Amino acid sequence: MADDSGTENEGSGCTGWFMVEAIVEHTTGTQISEDEEEEVEDSGYDMVDFIDDRHITQNSVEAQALFNRQEADAHYATVQDLKRKYLGSPYVSPISNVANAVESEISPRLDAIKLTTQPKKVKRRLFETRELTDSGYGYSEVEAATQVEKHGDPENGGDGQERDTGRDIEGEGVEHREAEAVDDSTREHADTSGILELLKCKDIRSTLHGKFKDCFGLSFVDLIRPFKSDRTTCADWVVAGFGIHHSIADAFQKLIEPLSLYAHIQWLTNAWGMVLLVLIRFKVNKSRCTVARTLGTLLNIPENHMLIEPPKIQSGVRALYWFRTGISNASTVIGEAPEWITRQTVIEHSLADSQFKLTEMVQWAYDNDICEESEIAFEYAQRGDFDSNARAFLNSNMQAKYVKDCAIMCRHYKHAEMKKMSIKQWIKYRGTKVDSVGNWKPIVQFLRHQNIEFIPFLSKLKLWLHGTPKKNCIAIVGPPDTGKSCFCMSLIKFLGGTVISYVNSCSHFWLQPLTDAKVALLDDATQPCWTYMDTYMRNLLDGNPMSIDRKHRALTLIKCPPLLVTSNIDISKEEKYKYLHSRVTTFTFPNPFPFDRNGNAVYELSDANWKCFFERLSSSLDIEDSEDEEDGSNSQAFRCVPGSVVRTL
């Protein structure tokens, strides 16, 4: 084949052997008939079957591969022309409601160039199988090979051998390179098959719960207390992640350490890859959304591939699970265990939590001046993380009874303490509850604004504070919006008094709050109220002892505390209330209450200012401390908790 004799001026469309054969025929001069067979010994080869069994060189292999590709391209172009010819326009009629259009099923290229939108069933079209599209567009060589292997010839038993694909006659070098690419792609496809299976699940969360139970042998719900809101914050979180790459598993401990105070990490493997179970306590409280974004970035997995809930901390079984797995070699633990695990697994803490002491709860409520049942229950429950008695209270089935008993006992102690104090001791005690420093001048300026002489007002206030008979009631009267209620409410608030209302006068017990108060206020007394007081309450206004009816209790004898009354009616000018003139001291506020441009009060009547007012004028009001009390009181703070006796050796 290397001999090129007689092949000069070759044509562009003919090969060398054709020209040689033609020259031989014309130079021999032998007349060969068409019916006569050729001599088999002329060339020295057996030309019977016309098959050359000699070794095929590399050039011929590449030529055959090129010819194969050219034929495949030609066939593909022919098929595309037929599709364009017989399928018609790629546009679908607007009145057609066919979800699976013919052109979109045959060729994704035609479906991609549509200008009109077509409604599709999302759930059924989200993951199309390869059988629905026969064009092969967009599929890699690995996917095509997998498809052929899966759908083999049924006559051959489904052995998956490919027929008429053109790859059987390609060269050895091309096959070797493509085989390496197939192996790499097949490995990658095998790694992602589990993730694709997860994405195809209708309920991913249920699937994750099932996989978690298969891996760890217990339900994820058994370890957590579910949060309905994704915005609720918590410091402790239980996270289960699926489909994690093994390279991330090795570095996760170092990645999570700067963000957490404690981390309990467990790794297992399944068909989807690495599975992570971690109990983590962050340095700051985080919501579920924040935890999902943080761990999703560290683990390089989608947020819907994780189960994130806070742990169930009020369960000894759950705490024991984390404790036992933490000391085994199957887990990696970072930091100190949370107190709720230590509390329920260490014997000393368990014994301390077993008994509840009501006296400690009452002492706490008394020290914090909390007497309302709802406030006691809420505030004391929040101490469960660091107070053993509060923890025992939370574990008790009698919380409502304990709260009620605590509130009753606290009110009894507070009432007895108030009754024991004189008015000057009470004012000093109320002043200790105000931390800020005020100014007494705004109160004096407000009284001058209402045309009230300060010295006469101070003398009347002194008699009122000490409960002098016939001077036990002060009435602030005047037109509306003059600051009567504001002035009296601020004074009652500082002195810790009570407020009664005539709206409850139909009840026999509407005066019952007077039994537990040091001072009192009756706001906005109308004509019927003054009539009622003139008829039934003359003895009370005198400041003399009188009996008060209390609900579910016997009548009690009390001395009415100093009483403030606000009204728009000036009883000093009403003749029909002449019997109240000597019992009620009246001050008139004629001017409107002043405000600045921003709507703030010009004269601030705050607790700090009232504290400064009584401290500044204590000598004029006869409430200053005596010489015996200047060095401090010798009385100890109230204690209702039994103390421990220390025996000396």
UniProtKB/Swiss-Prot annotation:
The modification Phosphoserine is found at residues 89, 93, 107. It catalyses: Couples ATP hydrolysis with the unwinding of duplex DNA by translocating in the 3'-5' direction; ATP + H2O = ADP + phosphate + H(+). The keyword Hydrolase applies. Pfam families: PPV_E1_C, PPV_E1_DBD, PPV_E1_N. InterPro entries: Helicase_SF3_DNA-vir, P-loop_NTPase, PPV_DNA_helicase_E1_C, PPV_DNA_helicase_E1_N, PPV_E1_DBD, PPV_E1_DBD_sf, Rep_E1_papillomaV, Znf_lg_T-Ag_D1_dom_sf. One of its GO terms (molecular function) is DNA binding. ATP binds at residues 478-485. GO terms for biological process: bidirectional double-stranded viral DNA replication; DNA replication; protein hexamerization; viral DNA genome replication. Residues 452-602 form the SF3 helicase domain. Residues 148-188 have a biased composition (Basic and acidic residues). GO terms for cellular component: host cell nucleus. Residues 146-188 are annotated as: Disordered. There is a cross-link at residue 559 (Glycyl lysine isopeptide (Lys-Gly) (interchain with G-Cter in SUMO)). Signal peptide: none annotated. Its EC number is 5.6.2.4. Its main location: host cell. A motif (Nuclear localization signal) lies at residues 83-85. A motif (Nuclear export signal) lies at residues 106-115. Phosphorylated. Sumoylated. Belongs to the papillomaviridae E1 protein family. ATP-dependent DNA 3'-5' helicase required for initiation of viral DNA replication. It forms a complex with the viral E2 protein. The E1-E2 complex binds to the replication origin which contains binding sites for both proteins. During the initial step, a dimer of E1 interacts with a dimer of protein E2 leading to a complex that binds the viral origin of replication with high specificity. Then, a second dimer of E1 displaces the E2 dimer in an ATP-dependent manner to form the E1 tetramer. HAMAP family: PPV_E1. This is Replication protein E1. It comes from Human papillomavirus 11. The lineage of its organism: Viruses, Monodnaviria, Shotokuvirae, Cossaviricota, Papovaviricetes.
